[in-house]
């Protein structure tokens, strides 16, 4: 495993795994577009997921598009996606709570000035 796949953020893995789970025949370009990450990051992420045993990659047979792949999360991959989803939600909830405190404080400050 190279260094780039080691340092990817768990949210990247979650987003990629979620898209693959929903759309197994999704292209790397479409993953990049929908997850708002670079095509290179998608490639490294897919490689890392495969090395962890969370993802299987199959080439479409008899497809005129020779670069078409089918992605499948392994049972361990589905489990890890669920685990990452819990962590993602927990982190986003904390971000929301912090932002709400900031908004409330700023609103109070502005209200008191007027």
Predicted feature residues:
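Amphipathic alpha-helical dimerization/coiled-coil segments
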Residues: 80-114
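Short, cationic-aromatic polyanion-contact patches
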Residues: 3-13, 27, 58-81
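Key DNA-contact positions within bacterial/archaeal DNA-binding proteins
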Residues: 29, 40
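Alpha-helical residues within the helix-turn-helix
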Residues: 33, 50-51
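Hydrophobic residues on short alpha-helical segments
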Residues: 13-21
